[in-house]
Swiss-Prot record:
Membrane-spanning intervals of the chain: none
Species name: Microcystis aeruginosa (strain NIES-843 / IAM M-2473)
Lineage: superkingdom: Bacteria
Protein name: Small ribosomal subunit protein bS16
Keyword Ribosomal protein: yes
Keyword terms of this UniProt record: Ribonucleoprotein, Ribosomal protein
Listed InterPro entries: Ribosomal_bS16, Ribosomal_bS16_CS, Ribosomal_bS16_dom_sf
PROSITE patterns in the cross-refs: RIBOSOMAL_S16
Similarity comment: family membership: Belongs to the bacterial ribosomal protein bS16 family.
Signal peptide: none
Organism taxonomic ancestry: Bacteria, Bacillati, Cyanobacteriota, Cyanophyceae, Oscillatoriophycideae
Length: 82
C-alpha cells in the first residue's frame, strides 16, 4: 500500500519534513517513490505539489493523520471533489 507521509530531515532539534509517497512497509527516512511537498513546523511553511498529491490520492494512496491535517488546511481535498 502507498502512504503519503512525512520524511524527517534537518539538524537535531530543528526538524523539517518532506511530504512523500512511500510504500507503507519502508522506513520513515527510506527512499520514497516520490517527493510531493515540504513542511516546516517551526515557521508553518508548507509547499505542495498539488497535482502530484491529487494524482497519488486518486491512485489510492492513504495519507497519515498528520499529512491529512496538512492537506485539509491547504484545501487539497476540496480541489479533488470539485
Amino acid at each position: 500500500m502507498i502512504k503519503l507521509r512525512l520524511k524527517r530531515f534537518g539538524k537535531k532539534r530543528e526538524a523539517s519534513y518532506r511530504i512523500v509517497a512511500a510504500v507503507s512497509t519502508s522506513r520513515r527516512d527510506g527512499r520514497p517513490l516520490e517527493e510531493l511537498g515540504f513542511y516546516n513546523p517551526r515557521t508553518d511553511e508548507v509547499r505542495l505539489d498539488e497535482e502530484g498529491i491529487i494524482r497519488r490520492l486518486q491512485q489510492g494512496a492513504q495519507p497519515t493523520d498528520t499529512v491529512r491535517s496538512i492537506l485539509t488546511k491547504q484545501k487539497i481535498f476540496e480541489k479533488i471533489n470539485a
